Regions:
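Sec-dependent N-terminal signal peptides of Gram-positive bacterial secreted proteins and lipoproteins
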Residues: 1-3
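Binuclear metal-ion centers of metallo-dependent hydrolases, dominated by the metallo-beta-lactamase
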Residues: 131, 138-196, 261, 266-291
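Active-site metal-binding motif and surrounding structural segment of the metallo-beta-lactamase
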Residues: 74-79, 86-137, 228-245, 258-263
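Active-site environment of divalent metal-dependent phosphoester hydrolases
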Residues: 86-88, 112-117, 139-142, 165-168, ...
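Core dinuclear metal-dependent hydrolase active-site scaffold
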Residues: 9-103, 152, 160-233
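Short, solvent-exposed amphipathic alpha-helical segments in soluble enzyme
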Residues: 228-229, 255, 279-280
Length: 291
């Protein structure tokens, strides 16, 4: 079903797994209903990290993949970050409908890889979308072209986010953008942009609580952030970079982030080293496939 985290008020800290009470974490009998029950959302900034069960690959290479998270502001504004892979778009749609969503106020596409933007066409066909944000990096793939064609077909407002930008989600949630760096078009081997390190990095803040998301940033991208911002990127809740893999979530990044809660978007523990790194830093670790 997924993992839900809420910040209850301007003076409260974030609590995990749709906590029933302040700071209480539990696994109820009907976990799906609690994760997608929005009756307790009012007055909270809530993040739901969706579990997409679509299988990619075969045999030992088969993995459940796709990345998508929903943030709901205290006054009911909805922001979707990424849409999963192509077949996962229907799963994202179904889970949004289970929440009673009929409009996505803000849709952020962190970077143009298929497991993050592939489901966009299906989502866009099912919901009104107020604003789309992208990282501005073009990508040579069918899913990227389909995404851009759908944006044009529906005449959706679409803007590029870069470090230094900021916007609001409702009246009380501020979103600060830390990456990618303006004009960051450095090419890597083969002449292609490093799509993962071009991921949009941003922090949502509500009162004293903060939520971080930065797509599939590699350790190189994380180092650029820590060298530029240091402890200024610290956040209460972090979605682990690159699904919690050890290509990302380096020691310096985890230390700078110092989260209370870390969420991995994968069908298992992608890296025990990464999980233990967050735990050693004082975080509770959750995976959207099991928690």
């Amino acid at each position: 079903s997924g993992t839900s985290v809420s910040a209850s008020g301007p003076g409260d800290s974030a609590s995990g797994s749709s906590a029933l009470k302040e700071g209480e974490i539990s696994q109820p009998e009907d976990y799906f209903d609690l994760v997608f029950d929005t009756s307790q959302d009012q007055g909270k900034l809530t993040a739901r990290y969706l579990y997409l069960q679509t299988i990619y690959g075969t045999g030992k290479e088969a993995v459940t993949t796709g990345d998508s998270a929903v943030y709901t502001s205290p006054d009911g504004m909805v922001m979707l970050v990424d849409c999963g892979n192509v077949p996962g778009g229907q799963e994202v749609t179904n889970q949004l409908l289970a929440m009673g969503v009929d409009k996505i106020d803000v849709l952020v596409l962190s970077h143009p890889h298929a497991d993050h933007v592939g489901g966009f066409v299906t989502v866009a066909d099912n919901f009104e979308i107020g604003q789309v944000y992208v990282n501005g990096h073009e990508y040579d793939s069918g899913t990227y072209r389909a995404m851009m064609e759908k944006i044009e077909q529906l005449s959706l407002p679409c803007e590029v986010l870069e470090a230094g930008d900021a916007f609001s989600l409702g009246e009380e949630v501020q979103v600060q953008v830390f990456g990618p760096t303006p004009g960051d078009t450095e090419e890597v081997a083969g002449g292609y942009l490093d799509a993962n390190d071009g991921s949009i990095a941003m922090r949502l803040t509500y009162g004293q609580s903060s939520f971080w998301t930065s797509g599939d940033l590699y350790i190189t991208g994380e180092q650029a952030l820590t060298e530029t911002y240091g402890q200024d990127i610290a956040s209460d809740v972090v979605k682990m970079n690159h699904h919690g893999k050890d290509t990302s979530n380096g020691k310096d990044f985890v230390q700078a982030m110092s989260p209370k809660i870390a969420v991995g978007m994968f069908d298992s523990v992608a890296s025990r080293t990464v999980a233990m790194r967050y735990i050693a830093g004082g975080a509770e670790v959750f995976y959207n496939s099991t928690d």
